[in-house]
């Protein structure tokens, strides 16, 4: 539930809140998204007791020895004021609205407005290019980074993923670069 605090309208449903699902659910969360602590590699899991020992063995061998300053920062983030999180989410909302409107103004793009997180996932089938081809072309010719929808599996064909975790100005510039690229081909 790493994006559970970054939503714009309806709060996301936790599977653990569904009657009978708590004992069948593993919740993984961390500090990277909500508290902008990306790369600090600190998170936690909530799970049925019978899984704890096995998960602990896995974690000790894959991600151990979290630095003490990181742990202290996590405590401060959890116990401190949360108004910074709310302000960050509102800024993401502003960027989402403007960026998705910009994408929807591009020929061949259709972008549903995401309800949370900080990604836009437009359908690009109207461009006539595959996800991989447009991903490569935008990076090479327009200087705009995205991710091919096929990075998420075969059903991602026809889509790109863009992050809105950048400045408003850079996002608007990216839309214009994409527009210029589409005009030039």
Language-model features and meaning:
Residues 1-185:
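PLP-dependent class I/II
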